[in-house]
Amino acid sequence: MAKWVYTFGAGQAEGSAEDRDRLGGKGANLAEMCNLGLPVPPGLTIVTAACNSYLEKGRSMPEGLREQVREGITRMEKITGRVFGDTNRPLLLSVRSGARASMPGMMDTVLNLGLNDQSVHALGHDAGDARFAWDSYRRFIQMYGDVVMGVDHEVFEEVLEDEKARLGHEQDTELSAVEWQHVISRYKEAIEEVLGLPFPQDPEVQLWGAIGAVFSSWMNPRAITYRHLHGIPAGWGTAVNVQAMVFGNLGNSSATGVAFTRNPSTGEKELYGEFLVNAQGEDVVAGIRTPQNITEAARIASGSDKPSLEKLMPEAFAEFEKICNALERHYRDMQDIEFTIERGKLWMLQTRSGKRTAKSALKIAVDMAEEGLISKEEAVARIDPASLDQLLHPTIDPHARRDIIGSGLPASPGAATGEIVFSSDEAVQAVKEGRKVILVRVETSPEDIHGMHAAEGILTTRGGMTSHAAVVARGMGTPCVSGAGSIRVDQRNELLIAASVTLRKGDVITIDGSSGQVLKGEIPMLQPELSGDFGKIMQWADASRRMTVRTNAETPADARAARSFGAEGIGLCRTEHMFFEDDRINVMREMILAEDEAGRRTALAKLLPMQRSDFVELFSIMHGLPVTIRLLDPPLHEFLPKTDEEIAEVARVLTIDPAELRQRVDALHEFNPMLGHRGCRLAISYPEIAEMQARAIFEAAVQAAHDTGAAVVPEIMVPLVGLRAELDYVKARIEAVAKEVIGEAGVNIDYLIGTMIELPRAALRADTIAESADFFSFGTNDLTQTTFGISRDDAALFLATYQQKGIIEQDPFVSLDFEGVGELIQIAAERGRRTKNGLKLGICGEHGGDPASIRFCEEAGLDYVSCSPFRVPIARLAAAQATINGREVAEVQALAAS
């Protein structure tokens, strides 16, 4: 028969901290504390597999579970000298959840289980405090009624508030035993009125009702949401911990509290926490009474006139402080600890690794490494790479009031406040006038780049995490919320229409690009700080990692920002972004609208010095580091005007007939531009465009090498190649231009020509394509689109539904799809290197900044990842963790093999 139950108590436990997967975090740590000889109330843990079995079998308890729980309770009875269900010396229980990953507050708890109309008298007699017994009973009815029976907790709150008002009491603690009895009678009446059922008096019925409720809470909406947000698989299930109750509400020599072994906000090495005298655990969290400081130093710092635990109960405090230090040394991490003091006796109820801010995490990791508790590699592995966003961008003050008017996708982290503007030109003008703005659009296009650059933040009602707005905003480090479908933009009347409010141009909003929230008004911000601890962790990370980290950048500002964050080159320079500046877009349009090659070459001659100067600046900033430049990729219609007003204006500037321009725009329109006339197909149709870009690159390389003294080896990348012949055609044109420039300059130029792998055919035919390529860069944005057959700009319409319904666990445009897209990358890497040993491989899609995707890149043997500038520190840390993890896995495999 399966073993469903593991017991602990009296210094012995069947499990340990190693059994987290089986016993959940809480159960494993209770067992571990027990094995360490710490004062832990006896109990039992029902394994996570029992939860999965219960949910899979239509909420039916697994065979053998009831018998094993009964055996565990018998052991608890022997240790405590109390009997479950007895009316003289009743054993009361707590029933708590405990998943293997910490999910604070997401699942259910029941305390004081086992009380009924008879045993409450025995509890009062035994404790010598009738009021305590009736208070415990009403808490149990309230909790059980809500969690197990499904009666809204507000029903109980209304009864209690009504009774307090009738009696003239302010606090719960003022009610007497008799008064609590009256509240309990009303509670039971309310339950019967709502459900038509009496409150259960049989402790066995109570116990199994509570166990079932905790199992079921694994699938409650808030738990499901939390799992989605934190990447916790639904298949893990939760353990259930059934433990003998100890009471912090047994008078003024009793207390309950929560503490951290270091400050979770700052990371300072100090005992940090709160407690309440004469209270149960949930009172500390509920905020019904103001908690007191644990240490005297904290009390003095806070200015509180209430005594600290250190002063009030010095013996219990001294023991608690000693245990806290021992637990931190044992687990080698900052601990979050729950405790109860029952009539002077200290009991440990929980320990777990404490949640902490990014700033605190850095300090704790660095300090512990320098204290010798952990190694530098362990310190690097302790930091959540995604949390570094908190350090690189302003964030909303967590204590600030939020007036949320809508929400979308957290497309680019950080928070921003400004006046609403509805066009990019307005954004630029407002900034010239010294005003801060949020650019609000249905969706953005490349022509909005000037407004996006000027705005403090960007809000779009359409688009996903890899939409134009999201990608560009991340690259610029500008906060962005995309796909806010609950908000409507009335462009004509310049209105932002939300469910609760309609706002006009000039009204102030705040966007939180880290959560996706859109808020009315100006909200207080916290400014980012990069501490010395950040620098140390990055230094240790760089010493550990194998892959290099480049950036996606095409502007000097982006390139400088990326260098300051530690980028080791440019992995993707999107040359088309350089053509959207005001002084260039019309020259580009002149080229597109030219009637023949001669006309195109005339316009391209005007663009050449512009591109060359851009490349000179990028090469100079990178000072000898690799720079990968992608030739023109998007379809030409993206550069053309769209509305009648825009067409009229462009026709005026180019001195052509608006009707003729409209006709040309319509002729270039494509039904599916993502799969249309773009990438290398443009270079083959109009080779003069690729030739101009190649000349600009080579001339810039010569000049930058002369100016800086650093060797410049440009890497020219041909996009959207599916056939080797396509690459061969474009490569021949590039090499011809290189030969011309070398002859003109009288100096040799080293360069590489490679391709983006962004089509499934290219991945499958990588062996032949590698014969003509010096490097591959995986363009995972398009490779994901073409593998799934999903347009990333439309994906937001249904991918969220897919996640909610469990069809996919992650948005494949945010975190790489390892099974499909990932396999294509592995195939291309293996086949490409089989043809050309040492072929350089990198990734330059948005996945280059995603920690899970970076881990995959390490496993696939890629040489570098490339991401937006503000994600470079995240990628450096994630790449180091991937290397460390890979080394550990290899060591385990080698050990197993021997």
Swiss-Prot record:
Q: Where is this region: Linker 2?
A: 512-546
Record protein name field: Pyruvate, phosphate dikinase
Task: Give the organism, scientific name.
Answer: Rhizobium meliloti (strain 1021) (Ensifer meliloti)
Spell out the reaction equation it catalyses: pyruvate + phosphate + ATP = phosphoenolpyruvate + AMP + diphosphate + H(+)
Which Gene3D superfamilies does the UniProt entry name for this protein? 1.20.80.30, ATP-grasp fold, A domain, ATP-grasp fold, B domain, Phosphoenolpyruvate-binding domains, Phosphohistidine domain, Pyruvate Phosphate Dikinase, domain 2
Q: Where does ATP bind?
A: R96
Entry domain remark: The N-terminal domain contains the ATP/Pi active site, the central domain the pyrophosphate/phosphate carrier histidine, and the C-terminal domain the pyruvate active site.
What taxonomic lineage is listed for the species of origin?
A: Bacteria, Pseudomonadati, Pseudomonadota, Alphaproteobacteria, Hyphomicrobiales
| Chain sites annotated for binding substrate | R574, R630, E758, G779, T780, N781, D782
Gene Ontology molecular function = ATP binding; kinase activity; metal ion binding; pyruvate, phosphate dikinase activity
